[in-house]
UniProtKB/Swiss-Prot annotation:
Glycans are attached at N222, N372, N438, N473, N625. A motif (Cysteine switch) lies at residues 170-177. CDD domains: ZnMc_adamalysin_II_like. Pfam families: ADAM_CR, Disintegrin, Pep_M12B_propep, Reprolysin. Residues 399-485 form the Disintegrin domain. One of its GO terms (biological process) is male gonad development. Binds 1 zinc ion per subunit. This is Disintegrin and metalloproteinase domain-containing protein 30. It comes from Homo sapiens (Human). Its cofactor is Zn(2+). Its main location: membrane. It is found in: Late endosome membrane.
Length: 790
């Protein structure tokens, strides 16, 4: 075993190792490795130095005092800019292979570069994102790696002295002939007169780092450790490339936490590189764009420690791979920088190439920096194009937080610049809400006020989606939820990842409303061939995997009853296959890998979750049992009055309330926010309850009305004095006698009245007779008149 120099007393070392071993037994990630890639180590306590004129709360350079081998060294550091985005995207996978995306919290301004005072050509790259100092630095020709000692309560750190490493020719697998062949397409485009313009403006490279499953296991499945390793690796590469005025920006990170996405068990790293560039182009580029991608592998190979292929800004196959074997960070970062140098046009150094007067440069066999030859190659390449390096990444760190249109820390809002804030009715330029305002942005914010409870802030997109509602107390809309995978939908389909998967619907979406799904004969005739029109997997530019007979129905979509050729995206090919025996015309589309970088979607591949038989679905181009969807929402769970969402909670129908749709309510789930009363849609349950309550209220009101009527009636009657019973009886008899007398009197009066009336009638009759007699007496007698004439 190699001897180790220890700069501690034996007692102190014993006290240091005991808690370290104890914590290790408890599962802590204690970084304490005296062997491996290090010559020696010692423990020190960095002392932060303060200077006059420092402004509290403003990011400024920092300095630490380190004592190594009995000598004091001052480490000056200043913050790195543009190293990370505001929200770093981290992709990982569940044990079932489902893709996850996270945006972990990373402290602001925790990455630094610097140098050691009074040390020749010293450089340092330090990260404080995990607490303590972690990184690399050199004092003269010696390189060190510093790590915080987690077992220490007094800010102790372990400083490792790295080996004097000469990588040799085994580092990079690229030969000079291969480099010349890869550079050939760019040579004729370069123009020497473009060098000054290219040098004047800095370049920016957006990088994606990937880590295989072995590396994830090496750090005890600690995803946070992998993230901070990636940040430090990128920081070291960025420090190297600042010499040529190019910045490295870590755009995203992918960790294969479940299994490796490509085969990595080849004896040579070059074969892994071939698989990786296919994965990058066919899978990674579809998820997010970048200028370059690099894969780290926890494995040794026979041919080299690192490989690369292609150039930045190329839509063709490009990428790099390297090994990451232990806790030594500087060596893998240097190998990555070497391969990234090839990606930006740098060749291997010749014997006459120098960096700071030395021969061990990055593009040779050392780690001092880039040589003068690398400078020339780099500027020659960027003069030939490489326009993607001109894009400035989004600023990840800004000193002035208020005004960047991002609500953060204690800000209530952020309307941007002063001019923009003058037009904002809700937010002030000091990132405070206007007086009387509740909010400024959000799906549940309108005219500076919260939307009322029950307002639909996100409509359902289809029958497999679910709506979300404002709660009246926040400007944010609840997270998007949808029906659980496996929920039945129309045309005998199933919901899967927020969409109804059905061959019938997929045929109509491509070939029009008259199209129908084809029978199994079409799938067998096409998908068992294994070309761009019929396959179960695209494995390369011109390589296709034919389907097995049992899985042919999960390959490329086949339709019938196609009347017209549809208008599809450019470069999409339609193919028809005639089956003479069945007299069928089968229709489908073709697809190949070169269409992926152009952003052309593959419309003709059967969607995962599509039914392929009774109790079976297509999943990853195989016809498998539908249990893979993990659908476990029985109707009884929601009392047959709702469905389960993707969080396995009941989303109730209108008229019933969550969580289990047992009580009367307005529907929704505990995840959707509270729905409101629908206009013109009152469910029967509410009608029944309303009628019962109305009748009950009427009954109560009737009883109350009768009661008060009787009370009021009794109250309005005149009061009567009480008297003795005998007196009351006498008065009652007198009253009775009086009543009889009155009745007799009344009867007598009636008889008198009748007699009087009779007399009057008799008198009137006599008068009429007398009047008649008088009239008759006055008439002349005719007989006497006749006698006088004679």
């Amino acid at each position: 075993m190699r001897s180790v120099q220890i700069f501690l007393s034996q007692c102190r070392l014993l006290l240091l190792l005991v808690p370290t071993m104890l914590l290790k037994s408890l599962g802590e990630d204690v970084i304490f490795h005296p062997e491996g890639e290090f010559d020696s180590y010692e423990v020190t306590i960095p002392e932060k130095l303060s200077f006059r004129g420092e402004v509290q709360g403003v990011v400024s350079p920092v300095s630490y005092l380190l004592q190594l081998k009995g000598k004091k060294h001052v480490l000056h550091l200043w913050p790195k800019r543009l190293l990370l985005p505001r929200h770093l995207r981290v992709f990982s996978f569940t044990e079932h292979g489902e893709l996850l995306e996270d945006h972990p919290y990373i402290p602001k301004d925790c990455n630094y570069m610097g140098s050691v005072k009074e040390s020749l050509d010293s450089k340092a790259t330090i990260s404080t994102c995990m607490g303590g100092l972690r990184g690399v630095f050199n004092i003269d020709a010696k390189h060190y790696q510093i790590e915080p000692l987690k077992a220490s309560p007094s800010f102790e750190h372990v400083v490792y002295l790295l080996k004097k490493e000469q990588f040799g020719n085994q580092v990079c697998g690229l030969s000079d002939d291969e480099i010349e062949w890869q550079m050939a397409p760019y040579e004729n485009k370069a123009r020497l007169r473009d060098f000054p313009g290219s040098y004047k403006h800095p370049k920016y490279l957006e990088l994606i780092l990937l880590f295989d499953q072995s590396r994830y296991r090496f750090v005890n499945n600690n995803l946070s450790q992998v993230i901070h390793d990636a940040i430090l690796l990128t920081g070291i590469m960025d420090t190297y490339f600042q010499d040529v005025r190019m910045r490295i920006h870590l755009k995203a990170l992918e960790v294969w936490t479940d299994f490796n996405k490509i085969r990595v068990g080849y004896p040579e790293l070059a074969e892994v590189l071939g698989r990786f560039v296919i994965y990058k182009k066919s899978v990674l580029n579809a998820r997010l764009s970048s200028d370059w991608a690099h894969l780290y592998l926890q494995r040794k190979y026979n041919d080299a420690l690192a490989w690369s292929f292609g150039k930045v800004c190329s839509l063709e196959y490009a990428g790099s791979v390297s090994t990451l074997l232990d806790t030594n960070i500087l060596a893998p970062a240097t190998w990555s920088a070497h391969e990234l140098g090839h990606a930006v046009g740098m060749s291997h150094d010749e014997q006459y190439c120098q960096c700071r007067g030395r021969l061990n440069c990055i593009m040779g066999s050392g780690r001092t920096g880039f040589s003068n030859c690398s400078y020339i190659s780099f500027f020659k390449h960027i003069s030939s194009g490489a326009t993607c390096l001109n894009n400035i990444p989004g600023l990840g760190y800004v000193l002035k937080r208020c005004g960047n249109k991002i609500v953060e820390d204690n800000e209530e809002c952020d309307c941007g610049s002063t001019e923009e804030c003058q037009k904002d009715r809700c937010c002030q330029s000091n990132c405070k809400l206007q007086p009387g305002a509740n909010c400024s942005i959000g799906l549940c914010c309108h005219d500076c006020r919260f939307r009322p409870s029950g307002y639909v802030c996100r409509q359902e997109g289809n029958e497999c989606d679910l709506a979300e509602y404002c709660d009246g107390n926040s400007s944010s809309c609840p997270n998007d939820v949808y029906k659980q995978d496996g929920t039945p939908c129309k045309y005998e389909g199933r919901c899967f990842r927020k969409g109804c998967r059905s061959r019938y619907m997929q045929c109509q979406s491509i070939f029009g409303p008259d199209a129908m799904e084809a029978p199994s004969e079409c799938y067998d005739a096409v998908n068992l061939i294994g070309d761009q029109f019929g396959n179960c997997e695209i494995t390369g530019i011109r390589n296709f995997k034919k389907c097995e007979s049992a899985n042919s129905i999960c390959g490329r979509l086949q339709c019938i009853n196609v009347e017209t050729i549809p208008d599809l995206p450019e470069h999409t090919t339609i193919i028809s296959t005639h089956l003479q025996a069945e007299n069928l015309m089968c229709w489908g589309t073709g697809y190949h890998l070169s269409m992926k970088p152009m952003g052309i979607p593959d419309l003709g591949m059967i969607n995962d979750g599509t039914s392929c038989g009774e109790g079976r679905v297509c999943f990853k181009k195989n016809c498998v049992n539908s249990s893979v969807l993990q659908f476990d929402c029985l109707p009884e769970k929601c009392n047959t009055r709702g469905v389960c969402n993707n969080r396995k909670n009941c989303h109730c129908m209108y008229g019933w309330a969550p969580p289990f749709c047992e009580e009367v309510g307005y529907g929704g789930s505990i995840d959707s926010g509270p729905p409101g009363l629908l206009r013109g849609a009152i469910p029967s349950s509410i009608w029944v309850v309303s009628i019962i309550m109305f009748r009950l209220i009427l009954l109560i009101l009737s009883v109350v009305f009768v009661f008060f009527r009787q009370v009021i009636g009794n109250h309005l009657k005149p009061k009567q004095e009480k008297m003795p019973l005998s007196k009351a009886k006498t008065e009652q008899e007198e009253s009775k006698t009086k009543t009889v007398q009155e009745e007799s009197k009344t009867k007598t009066g009636q008889e008198e009245s009748e007699a009087k009336t009779g007399q009057e009638e008799s008198k009137a009759k006599t008068g009429q007779e007398e009047s008649k007699a008088n009239i008759e007496s006055k008439r002349p007698k005719a007989k006497s008149v006749k006698k006088q004439k004679k």
